[in-house]
Each structure stands twice: as structure tokens, then as C-alpha cells.
């Protein structure tokens, strides 16, 4: 959602904002907007179906297989990513003035987008912490208690994410663009700040996003990777090489995307605080920030590949979902029971043979006893 700076604003009877003095977009800002639209379109077309397929497979699998803490964290990650991708079409069309909404609708989209992004990054941190506990073998043996605790942690994550996203809807409104012709009149959802709020409210908002979406995930992932590599040296070479390659792919792909994002957000926060509020500086900063805000959306396209399709367990369950086995819980449980005891018919035949042998031997002993018994008087 675009951030607009202006002064001398007025509200009409529909609570639509009319700004009399704003900066005209520069050529660089227009190019950045087109690039953002193209990248987000690719993310929607690829990341949306992938997250839907992965989330559906995970939910169906949780009905049959016992769900552990990592499984629930993965399910929450795919749900948060799918929710983020779902908001992108509205944001793209609204930024281009091709769709309009009420101020309440814009506020709902804003809080949903920022909360789902925050929940996604928080879930990645939870997955790292859970793997840290697995390495230390400090997982809870009580499955029921651990599952309840996991649900409580996820509820706390979403509550915290909503609290972190709550400042955004406060400044979200609808901007009415008054054109020369009726066809050129349109509305867009924006985050509006007056010039007097730039170095206070907007700077705080930028710093909060930089910390929650940038610094904290990078620090968490870097710490986990260094600790995991140190602990992995104690294991065998075969297990170490396979596990290290998998974890390196996860962590390094995250850091390659996230580290430039942190640098750009730190620069953006510095520019908001130190630069003068002029049209040239506003357009330059907005062009950089516009490309930086597609980085959180990139994770929605990469997470299903890294955390789902690169794993053997998920690929096995995905094939079960394609063949329709996960849709019938009774059928799947019967097949799993049959796999566990493949020699049941042979065992039953051997048991019947033993019973027949015992019956024949018992009949012979009874005949011998009856033959040796004295006749009745």
C-alpha cells in the first residue's frame, strides 16, 4: 500500500481524502511501480497455487498422521503466506486505481497483510527454535500437553502480529483522485501522513517494520545456522553432509533475500529522519522502498519450495493426496494397518493348522482312554 505525504487535506461526505498539495511521481518512481507490479504478479501466479496445494495437503495429512509441533508450525506458515498472497491482488489494483473500496475495507486489507507477514516471519523463528530443542533432545514427551502448548504459542503469535499491525490501519484511508474527465476520477487506498508526522510517526513505523521484518529474522536465522553447524560436527559424516546441505539451503536462501532488505529498510528509516521533505527526496525514497516491500512477498513463493517440496515426507504425502488416499481417513488407516502386518493371512493359516493338529491329538487321547477304561458293572 502506497505511503502518501501531503498537507492541506480535506475530507468529503464519504470520508474520502482530498489532498491539495502532493508531489507528482517521477520517472524513476513510475518504473519502480511497474517493476513492483510485475514481481507481485509472478508471486501471485506461482506462490498462490503452491501455498494452497501445500496447505491443503498439510491439513489433510494432519487428519491421519499425528501432528507434532513442527507440523503445526509448518501449517501455520503456509496459512500466513497464503493469506499474504491473497491480499496482493487488491493492493496491486488499488495502487493503480483500478479498484476502489471503503475506508473500512482498506483498513481491513492493511491489518490482514501486515499481520500475516509478521506471523510468517515469527513462525520461521519458531521453526528454528524448535529445531534447536530437537538438537538438544529437550522436546516434551507428553504429546497432548505439547500439542496444547503449540496451539497456545500460535495463538500468541497471531495476537502479537495483530498488535504490531494495528498502527497501520490508523493512518489508512481512501484518496480521491479528481480528474479532468469522469473516466479519470478514481480512488486508491493509501497510508497518509501529514508533513508534520513524517519524522515522528512515519519514522517510528519504518523502524518497527525494519526490526520485526528485517533485523530479528536475520539475527535468529544467523544464530541458528552457526549453532546448528557447531552441533552437527558431533554427528556422523553421512548424516552431517546431508543435513547440513538441507539446512544451508534453507538458511542461506533466507539470508540472501533478507539481508539486502534490512540494509534498504535501515537506509529508508535514516532517510525519513534526516532528509528534507521535498518532492525530489520523497520520490527517490519511495522508489527504493517500493522495490524493498516486495521482499516479504518473495518469501511466500520460496517457503513452500524450501520447507515442503524439498522434504521427503511431504513429497510422499503429496503423492498420497494426488492419488486421493488422504481424503478418506478410514481407508488410509486400513492401508497403514495392512502395511504394518503384511503376513497376517499366513499367520492365520499357521494358527489354524496348529489348532487342527491339537484337535486331532486330543481326539486320539480320548479314544485311547475310552478303550482302556473297565466296562461298567
Curated annotation (Swiss-Prot):
Domain of life according to the entry: Viruses
Subcellular location: Host cell membrane
Function (record text): Plays an important role in vivo, in particular in the dissemination to or replication in the salivary gland.
A Pfam cross-reference name: 7tm_1
InterPro entries attached to this UniProt entry: CCR1-9-like, GPCR_Rhodpsn, GPCR_Rhodpsn_7TM
UniProt name for this protein: G-protein coupled receptor homolog M33
Glycosylation sites: 20
Organism: Murid herpesvirus 1 (strain Smith) (MuHV-1)
SUPFAM superfamilies (UniProt xref): Family A G protein-coupled receptor-like
